[in-house]
């Protein structure tokens, strides 16, 4: 009798464990089934049509132009384009069309091989720094790399400013050719030139998200970053150089300085990719870069994929910047 009671007790304990576990598994499967397609996750491989429809749904839910009349008609066209799709690749034309209309010119689709090729071909380029008399010249290139590479990138400019802080009476920040990438290391590199607070904003359809600097920590900018010199602020004039290749995060960094005293831009209008992309991975490894927000300056100006005009348009921006800084 005692043996039966012990067995019954063990059975009740086992069932008590199994039932909550089953509920957890069921809940997990429900979540994956509902939200997984947004991240390329499925319980079973999707059909080509399902794959395409889910991609279009993600674009329509998050794209910056999803409320436009053009998108409404384009969405129906894209659905028809994937009706007879036999492979995931067959849906790519419809996805690309949807991205261009609902996401704008900054949005793209990259196949798995294209994404891998881009990653493999990226050459790490570090900032270059120098002193021109009492003027610091800092050139920040585009950046796309690991967190460790980002810290290495930022450290070049951070250490240079720290070591020469008593000599520097002005800064040239050269963003020409900076096509973007991860803004975190870029902003961290020059955080000593920026005041703590909200630097710029990502302007979504119904709300804003600020890029912030506090105690040396950059937040909401790519991978972010933390300066080893949070208390050091170099309050000197800053001249920013831009050209037609200054794009995306390069433009966002330019806007971090917009509206500040003793800041002036020189050169040519930027590329006009003043928007924020979100990465969505698809089931087959393809990646959608979808524009979900515009850049907004602390001045309240919203840049809807428009160029940032320089304060001084010139073919000799470095010379003009040095002249201004020394005047």
Where are the language model's segments positioned?
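N-terminal Sec-pathway targeting helices
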Residues: 3-30
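Membrane-interface motif at the C-terminal end of an N-terminal transmembrane signal
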Residues: 24-43
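Terminal peptide-recognition signature
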Residues: 55, 98, 138, 173, ...
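Extended, small/polar residue-biased N-terminal targeting/export presequences
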Residues: 65-133, 327
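STAS-typified acidic loop motif
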Residues: 127-153
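Short acidic catalytic loops
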Residues: 138-139, 160, 164-180, 240-241
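Gly/Ser/Thr-rich loop/hinge elements
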Residues: 180-237, 275-281, 285, 292-298, ...
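Low-complexity, Gly/Ser/Thr/Pro-rich intrinsically disordered linker/tail segments
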Residues: 301-304, 308-327
């Amino acid at each position: 009798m005692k043996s039966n009671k012990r067995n019954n007790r063990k059975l009740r304990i086992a069932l008590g464990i199994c039932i909550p576990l089953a509920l957890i598994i069921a809940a997990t499967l429900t979540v994956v089934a509902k939200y997984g397609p947004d991240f390329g996750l499925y319980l079973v491989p999707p059909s080509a049509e399902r794959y395409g429809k889910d991609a279009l749904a993600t674009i329509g839910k998050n794209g910056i132009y999803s409320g436009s009349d053009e998108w409404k008609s384009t969405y129906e066209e894209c659905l028809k384009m994937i009706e007879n799709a036999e492979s995931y690749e067959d849906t790519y034309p419809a996805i690309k069309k949807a991205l261009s209309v609902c996401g704008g010119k900054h949005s793209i689709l990259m196949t798995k091989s294209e994404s891998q090729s881009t990653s493999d071909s990226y050459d790490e380029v570090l900032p270059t720094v120098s002193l021109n008399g009492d003027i610091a010249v800092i050139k920040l290139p585009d950046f796309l790399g690991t967190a460790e590479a980002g810290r290495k990138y930022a450290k070049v400019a951070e250490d240079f400013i720290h070591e020469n802080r008593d000599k520097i009476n002005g800064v040239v920040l050269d963003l020409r050719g900076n096509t973007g990438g991860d803004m975190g290391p870029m902003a961290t590199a020059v955080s000593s030139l920026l005041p703590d607070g909200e630097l710029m904003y990502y302007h979504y359809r119904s709300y804003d998200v600020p890029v912030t600097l506090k105690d040396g920590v950059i937040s909401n900018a790519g991978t972010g970053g933390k300066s080893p010199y949070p208390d050091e602020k170099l309050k000197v004039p800053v001249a920013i150089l831009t050209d037609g290749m200054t794009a995306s995060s390069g433009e966002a960094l330019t806007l971090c300085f917009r509206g500040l005293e003793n800041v002036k831009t020189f050169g040519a209008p930027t590329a006009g990719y003043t928007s924020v992309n979100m990465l969505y991975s698809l089931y087959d490894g393809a990646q959608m870069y979808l524009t979900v927000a515009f850049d907004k300056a602390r001045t309240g100006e919203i840049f809807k994929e428009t160029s940032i005009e320089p304060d001084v348009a010139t073919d000799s921006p470095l010379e003009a910047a040095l002249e201004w800084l020394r005047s």
